[in-house]
Amino acid sequence: MCHKIEQLRSILDNSKYTVALCGSGMMEEGGFIGIKKQDKAYDIESRYGYCVEEMYSSAFYNTRPEQFFEFYKKEMLLRAPKDTATGSALAAMEQAGRLQCVIDSNIYDKAHRGGCRRVINLHGSIYENQCPRCKKKYSLTYILDAKRVPLCDECNVPVRPMISLIGEMVDSQNMTQTTEEITKSDTLLLLGTTMASEVFRQYIKYFSGRSLVIIHKAPHYSDKEATMVILDHPMNVLPLLGYEKKKQAESNASS
């Protein structure tokens, strides 16, 4: 592991433009079990009477808002992944000039909340909610505190979480920005995801840089195409690069 950490640090230190792609493994390291996982999906359907694909959809939000928000709050918000060391490690990398952009396929905004400034939340964020009619914005707390359906206090219609639900198109601006960032990257980090990812594979094909590094818990057949593979959770790897210690040392020196 020490040799790989040194090698990864060298790649990052010599990279002109580094982009990190954060996949579902980032949620798993925080204790979240994906709702599409077979056992989880079966459990949800047995408890709610509907499959995940039905409940986590715009059609369900529009036609059965009470059931949609019961599911959304219990399964997506109250079971949200815990913060891990990955968020602060990415922020330290960014501050050290070793990371130029984070592209997150998850909805929990962990990189941004960990301190990163340049983040593209490909599928939106649970922290962004608005009325579909008047566009008034509402906090996550407002959604959680609502007894049943969180309604706009101006229009009396259900507030819409600004996330991509199953079957919906990803925001076109996010898609364009993601493609542009990957195209100009010199180094691409795949964190908690693989080159065969349903979400990222359509973007990875635009990468023509020097180094593609995968940090993921489980091996995958597509790993052979990477420059380097580290089989572990990102939270166990990124802090070892030492950028957080460097950040702390610089902070102490300036105080």
Regions found by a protein language model. Give the residues of each.
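Conserved catalytic core of sirtuin-type NAD+-dependent deacylases
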Residues: 1-255
